[in-house]
Each structure stands twice: as C-alpha cells, then as structure tokens.
Amino acid sequence: MNPTTNLLVTRSTAFRGVPTTLRPFLASRYYATQQGLGATPRGPKRRAVTPFNDNGHVPWKQLSVAEKAARATQQSFNFGMILVGLMLTGGVGYFLWTDVFSPDSKISNFNRAVDKIRSDPRIIDVMGDSKKIAAHGDETFNKWRRARPVASSETTDARGDQHIMMHFYVEGPKNNGVARLHMIKYRGHSDFEYKYLFVDVKDHERIYLEHEDSSSKNGKKFSLFGVKW
C-alpha cells in the first residue's frame, strides 16, 4: 500500500463517527499534524554576521548581501589598522635613526664631545678623574642626569650650510663647568666639522678643545663617523 492510500485509510478511520459538517475542518488539522511529524528538523539558526562579530567561519557563499558588506567593512578596517601600524613603526624608526643612531644625530655629536672632554688632560687637571666626569643637559625636576635634555638647535643658513649648536653641563670631582659646541656641515660636504668646542670652569680660563681657526692651521683632518677630527 502506498503512502497516499495509507493516509486515506487512516483519515477515514479517524473521522468515523464525526459529523459531516466538522470533517473538512478536522481533516485540515489532521493533515497539518501529519506533515509536521514527517518534516525533517532544521539545524540551529546561525547568528547574523556583523562587522563586530565576524570571525570568518561562515563561508562567503552563505552570506547575505548585508553580511558580505559587513565582512568587507571589517576587513577594510583591519587593513587600515595594519597600514597605520606600519606608518607608526616607520616614523619611530626614522626618529631613532635621525636623533640617536645616525652619525650626524645630536646624540652622537653629544657623546663624541663628552668623550673629547673626558680625555683632555687640561679638563682632567681642572675637574678631576675622567671616569668620574659626567655630562648632562639643563636642570629639571628629574634626579637622573640622563633624563635631563641637552639644549641644542639645528639650522641651515642662506648658503646651505648646516649648523648644530648645543650647550650642556659638565660635573667632575673637583669642579663643574659648562660646555658649548658648534659644528658645521658645509654645503656639498658629507661631514660635520667643529667650529668650536670649549668648556668654561669658574675661576679658570676657557678651555678650547676644538677651534676652527686653530684647526685650519693643522691641515686636513681625518674623517670618521661623519665628523672631521
């Protein structure tokens, strides 16, 4: 017996004894019940994809138009954040190179000037042991010497020559002093040259470690790390 015949037999048996006027109504209810019992259960309904909850697990083909737009928005935002991160990383790298690691940076010139001061016999005689000579920038509320900024300026004159000028404080076991530095990179040259580097110590004569007039008499100097010595 096929399913249709079986359904008819069942219906005729179920409606036996029911008034004729009620049979059409009961038949429709009975059919709906039978259809519901025979239906295949659906799987759990998935959550709608938005730019804030999309994890990429739902395949692209199963997304609606709105969900595809949401995923595209999320991916565009993520790509933009990656670009911003790369730009910030490049900016930090450029800053570190120009201000710290480059041979022409202020930090490099400051460190070389301090090394020259510590190794000069006249400075050692006036200020004391070279190993105990320290240099730092302007006084601040910070007790750490290394955190005190060194006053400096970089300019380019009308002829295209680059100038670096700075002053900082030098402390030794015997005395304290103030150092001043002026360096020039002439247009068309690749190295900075000292115009002057001197230290003023109270009750002592100014000590010149570099002076353009005196250095020019000594002929051409050796160039290393972007500075002529």
From Swiss-Prot:
Keywords: Membrane, Mitochondrion, Mitochondrion inner membrane, Protein transport, Transit peptide, Translocation, Transmembrane, Transmembrane helix, Transport. The chain crosses the membrane at residues 77-97. Signal peptide: none annotated. The keyword Ligase does not apply. One of its GO terms (biological process) is protein import into mitochondrial matrix. Residues 1-31 form a transit peptide. Residues 32-76 are mitochondrial matrix. It holds the Pfam family TIM21. Its main location: mitochondrion. It is a single-pass membrane protein. The keyword Amino-acid biosynthesis does not apply. Gene3D superfamilies: Mitochondrial import inner membrane translocase subunit Tim21 (3.10.450.320). Residues 98-229 are mitochondrial intermembrane. It is found in: Mitochondrion inner membrane. GO terms for cellular component: TIM23 mitochondrial import inner membrane translocase complex. Belongs to the TIM21 family. Component of the TIM23 complex, at least composed of TIM23, TIM17, TIM50 and TIM21. Essential component of the TIM23 complex, a complex that mediates the translocation of transit peptide-containing proteins across the mitochondrial inner membrane. Required to keep the TOM and the TIM23 complexes in close contact. At some point, it is released from the TOM23 complex to allow protein translocation into the mitochondrial matrix. PANTHER family: MITOCHONDRIAL IMPORT INNER MEMBRANE TRANSLOCASE SUBUNIT TIM21 (PTHR13032:SF6). This is Mitochondrial import inner membrane translocase subunit TIM21. It comes from Gibberella zeae (strain ATCC MYA-4620 / CBS 123657 / FGSC 9075 / NRRL 31084 / PH-1) (Wheat head blight fungus).
